[in-house]
Swiss-Prot record:
Keywords: Acetylation, Methylation, mRNA capping, mRNA processing, Nucleus, Phosphoprotein, RNA-binding. The gene is RAMAC. This is RNA guanine-N7 methyltransferase activating subunit. InterPro entries: RAMAC (IPR028271). It comes from Homo sapiens. Residues 2-55 are annotated as: Interaction with RNMT. It comes from the Eukaryota. The keyword Transcription does not apply. The modification N-acetylthreonine is found at residue 2. Regulatory subunit of the mRNA-capping methyltransferase RNMT:RAMAC complex that methylates the N7 position of the added guanosine to the 5'-cap structure of mRNAs. Promotes the recruitment of the methyl donor, S-adenosyl-L-methionine, to RNMT. Regulates RNMT expression by a post-transcriptional stabilizing mechanism. Binds RNA. Residues 76-93 have a biased composition (Polar residues). Belongs to the RAM family. Interacts with RNMT; this interaction enhances mRNA binding and cap methyltransferase activity. One of its GO terms (biological process) is 7-methylguanosine mRNA capping. A motif (RNMT-activating domain) lies at residues 36-42.
Amino acid sequence: MTDTAEAVPKFEEMFASRFTENDKEYQEYLKRPPESPPIVEEWNSRAGGNQRNRGNRLQDNRQFRGRDNRWGWPSDNRSNQWHGRSWGNNYPQHRQEPYYPQQYGHYGYNQRPPYGYY
């Protein structure tokens, strides 16, 4: 096995004229006409191949409408689901004073103070 120190000068000598005017193979490659890019049809279609050129794209999302014609999940009636009842706990939903762990300082972990503060 050859040493790296010996191999580097050999490779530099072998490829000294690579990608230059003296490289005949590269010059032939440059003379070729450019290849056309691949054509990918219907790359953003959701339903498969039989949905070509649908005019109104808004109709694709009809099944996601809720009961009162709002956008959301099917039959999304979360607003009137509980009818004012609590979720099963009697704990207050908001604390009187906000709880911030003080181990990271005023601006939190990995946050910077506002520009010009330093």
